[in-house]
């Protein structure tokens, strides 16, 4: 059996909270066309991401990448600021 690794997902979003130690909350928005109404709908979701150096603040545009589970809710790591 081959060991083929799947590529990790990368998302872009805005930091909306950096109050916790080594964790930021990132809001990721996506747009899609509604299948029935044919109107573009904007949906957002919040992710808890690991920030090991506590250097990101509210309002920063960041990229997050999928990783192993770090805690109960954290499975994303901040990789860079846009």
Swiss-Prot record:
Transmembrane regions listed in the UniProt entry: none
A Pfam family: Ribosomal_S17
Family matches, as CDD domains: Ribosomal_uS17 (cd00364)
GO cellular component, one term: cytosolic small ribosomal subunit
Protein's recorded name: Small ribosomal subunit protein uS17
GO molecular function: rRNA binding; structural constituent of ribosome
PROSITE patterns according to UniProt: RIBOSOMAL_S17 (PS00056)
Cross-referenced InterPro entries: NA-bd_OB-fold, Ribosomal_uS17, Ribosomal_uS17_bact/chlr, Ribosomal_uS17_CS
SUPFAM superfamilies given in the database record: Nucleic acid-binding proteins (SSF50249)
Function in brief: One of the primary rRNA binding proteins, it binds specifically to the 5'-end of 16S ribosomal RNA.
Family of this protein: Belongs to the universal ribosomal protein uS17 family.
GO annotation terms (biological process): translation
Subunit structure: Part of the 30S ribosomal subunit.
Keywords noted in UniProt: Ribonucleoprotein, Ribosomal protein, RNA-binding, rRNA-binding
Keyword Ribosomal protein assigned: yes
């Amino acid at each position: 059996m081959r060991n083929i690794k799947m590529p990790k997902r990368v998302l872009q979003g805005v930091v909306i909270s950096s109050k916790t130690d080594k964790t930021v909350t990132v809001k990721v928005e996506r747009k899609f066309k509604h299948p029935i109404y044919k109107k573009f709908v904007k949906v957002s979701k919040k992710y808890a991401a690991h920030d090991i150096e506590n250097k990101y603040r509210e309002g920063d545009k960041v990229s997050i990448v999928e990783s192993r589970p770090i805690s109960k809710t954290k499975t994303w790591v901040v990789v860079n600021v846009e």
